[in-house]
Amino acid sequence: MIDLQGYGPRLLEGALVTLEVAVLSLLLALILGLLTASAKLSRHWLFHRIATLYTTLIRGVPDLVLMMLLFFGGQIGVNMITDWLYYEFDVDIFININEFIAGVVTIGFIFGAYMGETFRGAFLAVDSGQLEAGRAYGMSNRLIFRRIQFPQMMRHALPGLGNNWMVLLKTTALVSVIGLSDMVRIAAEATKATHEPFLFMIPVAVVYLLIASVSEWIVARLQKHYNVGFGEADEWNN
């Protein structure tokens, strides 16, 4: 392992933290994205309005501002609630929100909106006639979703999901501003102590590039999997 003036092991730990934040944020964003897409496609006006407000908020407010608002505002809100609950007992309780959890929730919340738009477009791209044909054959809604809608939806969604993941990966650098010791924060601390920015920032850039390269390979494999059979079908249609 490269020692990097004693900061090598800490940078490796920071890289693992960055990867954990990215993966967990992605999982949360995918869940929120599916819920948002379902709400936007719903005929229920309230669900549609809430989803529209959510995506508009995320598009209009910078990620860094949202990170600060959710972390510090959430901490203030939680402590206000505990003060109210324990007011009669004259107990002073102060709760610190974990930086890791705050980072995952914030990034997942931000990218849930973008994933929602990606999923919505992908669902709309699936031919509704195929869904009607599935119902005509007596298939349940769950089976139609699993066998017909989901595979075709993923075919259309994967390029957008891959792009969102790449942006999400780079956005994880923002967690350093709330005190989480990811590799960006550790590299910044090492730079401040040694006055050698390139010695630490270049390895950080290399790690991000490695993760991005592996991610591109995974997305390409998934696209190949979900595109099986569609090339031949397109040739027949032409």
Residue ranges and their predicted role:
Residues M1-N238:
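Transmembrane alpha-helices and adjacent helix-loop boundaries
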